[in-house]
Amino acid sequence: MAYLRSLSMISPLSLNFYGIMVLGLSVILSLIGLLGLYSAANGQFDIWAEKQGIMVLILFFIVIAFSFININVFYCYAYHIYAVTLVLLVVAEILGYTAMGAQRWLRFGFVNIQPSELMKIGLILALARYFHATKFTEIKTWKGIIFPIFLTLVPVALVLKQPNLGTATILLLVSGAIFFIAGVKIYKFALVLGGVIITGPICWNFLHDYQKQRIMTFLNPESDHLGAGYNIIQSQVAVGAGGIYGQGLLQGSQNQLDFLPEKHTDFIFTLLAEECGFIGVVLILALYMLLISMCWLISRNSNALASRIIAAGIASLLFVHIFINIGMISRSEEHTSELQSLRHIS
């Protein structure tokens, strides 16, 4: 049990400070997300903001409750949590309902659950437990990373089956960050990347038509400005219309005239960019970077590898979501409907 006692993350004083910072920043970003939903509904709470507000309140109390649970508990049950989320992915494949072209949702009463989102946490916990319990000399060998690769590829394959290319990509990127933190040699990443590049043309043939269309549209949205390229073009127009100071809450022309697509989900950050302007966007990104920094500080000050991986894994998860979402808006990354919006990240 000695290894369990070694899992305390950092000193109580530092943990309280970082914990309060993480919670406070999460609340602020959640409120900004609710404000965006309020604006997306043309000044009404009862369409999207009210439901999201209830979920934020529930999750707030869940987070408070979880803060009293010793991290050893999550370590001990890491594989169990992973197994449950994996089973939910399989159940979603069999009994789940389809939304936006993919079978990825489960209904539990009035609550809809997306198992692939739960898997992000389950995978982080499972990898943290494995690498913590494995000798560093073994991690540096190919044999030592076979099992964590298996832990990663099984849910990735199930998520791709839905199909949900965006979430599968996120799982791979976050897992890659965890492998690096755990001490896996750089040359192994290079070999994997080389394999991906070589097999890229083959993988293209296995993509769904709508996924190929998104990639081609991203490269040249003007080729179909009224069809597949409409979302990207309107998003860029909205961002540009925001200028330095923004057009003001409920004053965004793209938003109020309903030119902005999916403004309550995938393009909510575009809505905020139009109404809050460049200054507002910088402030929001600063809050996100501060939140990620707090997670990294928790990781760096942790005494055990499992604690470092859990904190760094969550930081990586946030960063990947933000990078892809902002990249989609600025057309520096391909947009997929699977990627979560600002309100989901917050």
Model-derived regions, located:
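Hydrophobic alpha-helical transmembrane segments of multi-pass inner membrane proteins, especially
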Residues: 23-231, 270-330
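Nucleotide phosphate-binding site architecture
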Residues: 132, 245, 333
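TM-adjacent membrane-interface loops and short helices in multi-pass inner/ER membrane proteins
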Residues: 217, 221-265, 276-280
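Alpha-helical transmembrane segments of integral membrane proteins, especially early/N-terminal helices
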Residues: 12-21, 79-87, 237-245
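Conserved protein kinase catalytic core
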Residues: 39, 252, 344-346
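Short, Lys/Arg-rich, polar N-terminal cytosolic tail immediately upstream
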Residues: 1-15
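Single conserved hydrophobic/aromatic residue that forms the stacking wall/gate
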Residues: 334-346
